[in-house]
Amino acid sequence: EISKRDVKDKEGDLTREPEMVKAYRDSWYLGTHSYASYLVDRLRCGREMLAETGSIFLQIGEENVHRARQIMDEVFGEENFISTIALLKTTSNTTRFIAGVYDHLLWYAKDIRQVKYRQLYFQKDFGAEGALEYTQIDLPSGEKRALSILEKRGASDLPEGGRVFRLDNLTSQSRSASTAFSYFWEGKTLGPGAGGWKTNLVGMNRLAAAGRLRTRQIGNTITYVRYIEDFAAIPLANMWTDVSSGFNVYQPKLYVVQTNERIVERCILMASDPGDLVLDPTCGSGTTAEIAEQWGRRWITIDTSRVAVSIARQRL
């Protein structure tokens, strides 16, 4: 019951009902109806326990993501929806049609006006995600050229001292008095078009002095040189392709519904600070508690199965 306050956590208070052999499998006697009822009860209870700055994450497959989203909209309110994060899997069930390789992570806030959020970043590496548009190189001699196919693939070393760069847009859709002006460059007077430049006249002169300006022939406008090290990180977005649930020798999959540790880690880091309290109402083997402990969060983990509780207790 949601309002029940006399819950005990001693050994004698755990259920004495016979355990199923499939201790880590989800089983629903009435199918979708059982699942929906289970979800509503636990989400309502979870919302009651959340801090005003708190978040809730629900990982789910494509079969029921639409049902779960509808239920969470009802319990938390549509206005408190934050994101649906796509989680890449390495395998999919055999099917006659297109293979499904994504799970979904639904993210809601208790109060979106107060929710705690900490932006995470990836390191921007040449040739990797977030850096594929860096296709030119600035050599110590002053020569600037396009990277070769072998250099782009990493099959050939980059010249020593070379700096990889891309040509980036210097115009903005917004327009103000300080950014709407014509600029004389390489014998031409060029304007920003219907919008404005991304910087003022002082900034343009600074870019020119640093050798950062280039003329774009298509569109007859000015671009600027952005080196890959200018901002060596890219913000984490809602497509996670490096959290494959296929697992490997370093992180073997031991249970049917086991979650990749990296997913849990990111959720904790995005939505909490050290000292905050993390709750996992479907304990399993205790992965969430272990990650929370590693990152200095307090934690509570619970499960209806004595098998899960016993394994988690030994692990932790």
Language model feature labels by segment:
Residues 1-277, 309:
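Class I S-adenosyl-L-methionine
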Residues 282-286:
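Class I SAM-dependent methyltransferase "Motif I" SAM/SAH-binding loop
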Residues 287-297:
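Conserved SAM-binding loop of SAM-dependent methyltransferases across substrates and taxa
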Residues 294, 313-316:
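Short, conserved SAM-binding/catalytic segment
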Residues 299-303:
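Conserved SAM-binding motif I beta-strand of class I
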